[in-house]
Amino acid sequence: MKRAFMTLFAVLAVLQLAAEEPAPSARLTLTLDRALEIALNDNPMIRVADLEIQRQDYVRKETVGNLLPSLSASGSYSYAAIKQTMSRSGLTFGGDNTVSLGADLSVPLFVPAVYASIKMNRTQMEEAVESARASRLSLVNEVRKAFYNLLLLRESLDVLHESESLSQKTVDDTQGKFEAELASEYDLLTAQVQLSSLQPTIIQTEGAIEVADLYLHMLLSLPMDVALELEGSLDGFADAAEANAYYSTDISNNSDLRSLDIQARLLENQLKVVNAQRMPTIAAFGQFSLYGNDMPEINFGDAGWGSMFPDVDLAKYPDLVAGVTNALGPAGMADLAGLMGDLLGGMGSSSATTSHSFWWQHPLTFGVSISIPIFSGTRVNQQARQTRIAIEQLQLQREYQEESLGMQVRSSISNLMTARSKMAASETSVAQAQKAYDITDARYGGGMGTILELNSAQLQLTQARLNYTQAVYDYLAAQADYEQIVGMDYEVAGTEQNQ
């Protein structure tokens, strides 16, 4: 039993230690297309832009709702604790309990302002879609350059490590020669200094890689504990860009210009909304009411008048009977019956019977209403003038923006050509520096060259490789900037991401 308990305790301890050990971080292999796809799906700014499109759709539906019929109902109940009297005699009128129900129906028939607002809402939807497209273009540009920058830093680090290996080889060779008394201590120290001087650059590059990696994580909305493995190389992306290179100065798809065009249409629709305030509106309406109270109703057949005038059919005079009953009330009618009985010789009874059931009325009304604006000061005129001035301002702004973008696209193409030339020149420099290093290394190994010549050749080779890597990145970054300026949409799996 004790052994079983100890075994169980040991198993639990192992499980506890395993739980306390940090889980290995996940690894994600990223191609450029995969990185762009993740960013376009998960980046918060893209989701905000998509939500704005949904919001504008609800705004449009809200405006359309103004063309639909509206129906409202109301109801009330009141109890007369103290009734209103007609005179000093104390005669009262009205019921103790009153119920009122009602329904109102309104159907718009001609509403110019709503029609203009619906057109404006459609333009607002186009503006939201174009804003989302601009966000996607900007994000694609940022992700591409962040991806290229991380590749640049990692390839630069590889170049520095290769240079470090060459320097270490030189130190080892010089150390052997020094021990064999074939090289001076100065040569050994020079080789060691060359090796040590690479460490600060390597450390700085490693720090830059960490920052670039964090930035790419942020753009892709990925957890920071996910390790990224990038597929592809700068040379491969440059070759693909060269194969598909076609540069045009057409800026008709530029997002800024398209946004200005949409804003111009939006202002024109706004002017129509303002002018629609001058036009009449027509609507149909209907009203239904239901009223009820428990005002006592006098039955003249049981009162003095019925026996007093047996040959008179009081049902022929309902309005008179109802009017007198409502005006005098039960007590007044009883007094009136008694008075008439006394005047007519005591004929009939001096009292009348009453009924306390609810009396209901239900009037129903239909009609058409028209509202014609006649004079509202100068409010509408001033609003129209303000909108026209805004349209003129936007036209001037668009002309300036078009000229500016024309300059930018030409400058971008010039940067592409310059970067391509630098890339070709740097590639030639790498080949020349490699050949010079091989010759110098052979001379130094044969005892004909000096350590200074070897260090200089190695430094030139390292710098040439770094310059070439930087030139390739500059070319790819210029390509990304050019595509953003001309408004080239990114395509996913053969389907255009933004229409």
Feature-to-residue mapping (PLM):
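Sec/SRP-type N-terminal targeting helices
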Residues: 47-51, 64-65, 109-136, 186, ...
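Transmembrane beta-strands of outer-membrane beta-barrel pores
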Residues: 77-81, 109, 288-292, 372-374, ...
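Residues on the lipid-exposed face of transmembrane beta-strands in outer-membrane beta-barrel proteins
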Residues: 77, 103-109, 216, 368-372, ...
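Acidic, low-complexity, intrinsically disordered peripheral segments
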Residues: 6-7, 20-25, 81, 299-304, ...
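Short flexible linkers and secondary-structure junctions
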Residues: 20-145, 149, 205, 282, ...
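Amphipathic alpha-helical coiled-coil segments
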Residues: 49-63, 135, 139-158, 176, ...
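Bacterial Sec-pathway N-terminal export signals of envelope proteins
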Residues: 19-76, 224, 231-270, 279, ...
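Periplasmic alpha-helical coiled-coil/stalk elements that build and connect Gram-negative outer-membrane
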Residues: 138-255, 263-265, 274, 415, ...
